[in-house]
Amino acid sequence: MGHILYASAYRANYLYLILIGRIVSGFGFSLWMYCKRYCSDPRIVGVRRRTTLASCLVVGQGLGMSLGPFAGGLLYKIGFSNSIFNGFTSPGWIMAAIWSVFWIFVIQFYEDIPIDQRGFNDPSSVAPSTPTSNNPTNEKDAPVRDPTIPPLSAPLPKYRMSHAQWGVTICMCWFAMTSFFILGAWESNLPVLGADTPKFHWSPFAAGNFIALGGITTFPFLILNLLFARRTQDRHILAFGSSLGFSALLVFLSLLRSQKLNYGSAFMCWWGVALGFNVASTVTISTLSKQLPPSWNNRTSLAIQYSNYTGRVTGAIWGGAGVHLGMMNYVGLEIALVGIGSILFMFLWHDLKTKMG
């Protein structure tokens, strides 16, 4: 519905219809925050497969980050001389059709996990052993019940997080927010920067191709991350991704300061940012799910997704205003966010150790 409203704004000649369409789409896409919980759901995913599954999700994320800008720029370039379906409205109509087909497949083939199904490895679902008695009992009259799984009506024991677990939670939420803040900021800033810089003078088509090219070239490395995730600790993946992205930000800042920014150097910085923070975002939900009881999966996934959405929304606003506020200030804030995360990371290094995979 949001895409249809967005695409109808051109024909209706009503600017605020674009805003209304984006708001409706935002409400709809906010429900996607629940998809990551399936990467750490103990009922279907073991501890040693959660980072791998989250890496698969990031591969799809990278594919969308590449295909979306390229398709948008290509449709703008083609144009279509039509007041309803043209270079501005065609992405909205096409996405509305794609989502319609998607939901048909969901209705036909998707099966959700029963709510009453408990995770077999949930420590909160294990009942304490009962003391034995010397009094004889009639086994035929006793009800048959699995001794390790309590009735669904039994209240779960209260779990209290330790100080270390609180620290890990804050660290993972911070990196989830920072990664999506920087990715969203760069995606919204590059078209504005390219159009404002005389050396580039990008059209929407050229800006879309630039963003897509950076995403496509990171794709093989995201596949490698998927393969190595089973044999690498989450904290090492986080350290590599955040360090790569941080280095790219420092190089970009030095290029802006020296006024030596060109197409090649800008591309390498965008590539480093896209790869680094996409890789860093793979371990946030998996690390947190390994630190806390399986019964907390919904809470941990929501905490990470709220952080992702906070970063994505504020990052897009910050990136769009980057040229107006000054590119040095724009990059400086991103470096500061990563720096704060690095301090948390170093203090919690030993507490971030989890099972691989």
Model regions: which residues?
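Helix-to-loop junctions at the C-terminal end of transmembrane segments
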Residues: 76, 220-236, 323
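Extracytoplasmic gate region of multi-pass secondary transporters
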Residues: 167-209
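A late C-terminal transmembrane helix in Major Facilitator Superfamily
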Residues: 291-326
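Glycine-rich segments within core transmembrane alpha-helices of 12-TM secondary carriers
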Residues: 49-76, 307-315
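Cytoplasmic helix-loop-helix junction between adjacent transmembrane helices
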Residues: 21-60
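C-terminal transmembrane helical hairpin of 12-TM major facilitator-type secondary transporters
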Residues: 233-283
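C-terminal membrane-cytosol helix-exit motif in multi-pass small-molecule transporters
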Residues: 72-73, 96-120, 345-348
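Hydrophobic core of transmembrane alpha-helices in multi-pass small-molecule transporters
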Residues: 2, 15-32, 262-279
